[in-house]
């Protein structure tokens, strides 16, 4: 709501805190990607399990490196209470397709802690998008005929055509 009123990403998140689910106080993770490819990420969490204090961390990527992405996890490992993620977002090499990206991310999340994952690819030239949703308890998917393989972007289709032509 705040961003739709012209406020910044950080200003919008200054109106929020972590989840009030004592003793874990689940962190809230947010990100925004801009049309120029730059992006910002945030984690809002309690001060080492102190529900009276919020800590807000913002990460700005104004000139992202092609093929690289960043990841923030809610928690760093199991515990009682569960300890929140610490440090800077983890850097990783981005797979070529949204399907590879989403499947790889889902497969590498801790099975005891993962609940849901949403991934979206947007063609910046046409604005067309495709979504993938994973849910630990129910198979959920939208915008896709086949939940295992999302629609390909035009450049991905061209690459497949070239590979098919080379094989013939």
Where on the chain are the PLM-derived regions?
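Conserved short alpha-helical segments that host acidic/polar catalytic motifs at enzyme active sites
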Residues: 1-168
């Amino acid at each position: 709501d705040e961003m739709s009123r012209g406020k910044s990403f950080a200003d919008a998140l200054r109106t929020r805190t972590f989840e009030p689910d004592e003793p874990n106080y689940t962190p809230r993770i947010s990100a925004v990607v801009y049309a120029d490819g730059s992006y910002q990420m945030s984690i809002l969490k309690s001060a080492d399990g102190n529900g009276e204090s919020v800590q807000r961390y913002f990460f700005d990527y104004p000139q992202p490196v092609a093929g690289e992405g960043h990841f923030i996890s809610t928690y760093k490992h199991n515990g009682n209470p569960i300890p929140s993620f610490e440090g800077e977002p983890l850097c990783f090499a981005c797979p070529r397709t949204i399907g590879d990206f989403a499947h790889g991310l889902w497969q590498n999340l801790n099975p005891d802690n993962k609940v849901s994952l949403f991934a979206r690819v947007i063609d910046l030239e046409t604005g067309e998008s495709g979504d993938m949703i994973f849910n630990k308890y129910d198979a959920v998917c939208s915008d896709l005929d086949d939940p295992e393989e999302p629609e390909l972007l035009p450049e991905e289709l061209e690459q497949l055509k070239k590979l098919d032509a080379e094989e013939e």
